[in-house]
């Protein structure tokens, strides 16, 4: 199902909340080609793209350079823009990015992925090769909580099935659901 207007789905949440896991579930079974221009992205065909690279640890917009916002905002304003734009993480979760998307006609939905403090702690501790600076982590947590508070929808990061059901009710979820393969 191809949308009649451009759609954007962007997942935000604290490090370890389950954004990458949820995005992987939303795009499960969808074949893609990795592309580098205008920024690294996964091309699922039919003008459906996910910003960033595919990898098991820290995928998505975490793989983009800090200056990625300039080419991404130019892309969403162009005639070659994706019809469905997916993203997750805080790299591009800025007013500049969301405003550019909305100004270009995107129906943008920001979804907060939320879990309790104990779950976040357990998930972070399970990442034995990830030991972030505490000041950096506090900054990310603060930014993520603010983004979730302003999100259009908040889904549980500890109940993947329920989170997917809530997103599948959205116009962008309808498109992705039609493309997903079990």
Which residues does each PLM region occupy?
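Phosphate-binding P-loop
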Residues: 1-6
């Amino acid at each position: 199902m191809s949308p009649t207007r451009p759609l954007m789905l962007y997942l935000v949440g604290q490090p370890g909340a389950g954004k990458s896991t949820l995005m992987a579930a939303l795009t499960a079974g969808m074949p893609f080609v990795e592309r580098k221009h205008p920024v690294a992205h996964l091309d699922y065909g039919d003008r459906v793209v996910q910003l960033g690279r595919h990898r098991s640890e820290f995928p998505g917009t975490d793989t983009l350079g800090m200056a990625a916002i300039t080419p991404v905002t130019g892309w969403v304003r162009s005639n070659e823009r994706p019809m469905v734009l997916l993203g997750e993480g805080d790299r591009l979760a800025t007013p500049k990015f969301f405003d550019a998307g909305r100004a270009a006609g995107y129906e943008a939905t920001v979804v907060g992925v939320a879990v309790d403090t104990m779950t976040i702690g357990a998930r972070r501790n399970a990442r034995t090769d990830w030991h972030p600076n505490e000041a950096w982590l506090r900054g990310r947590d603060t930014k993520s909580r603010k983004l979730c508070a302003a999100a259009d929808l908040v889904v549980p990061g500890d109940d993947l099935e329920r989170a997917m059901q809530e997103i599948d009710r959205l116009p962008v979820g309808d498109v992705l659901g039609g493309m997903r393969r079990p």
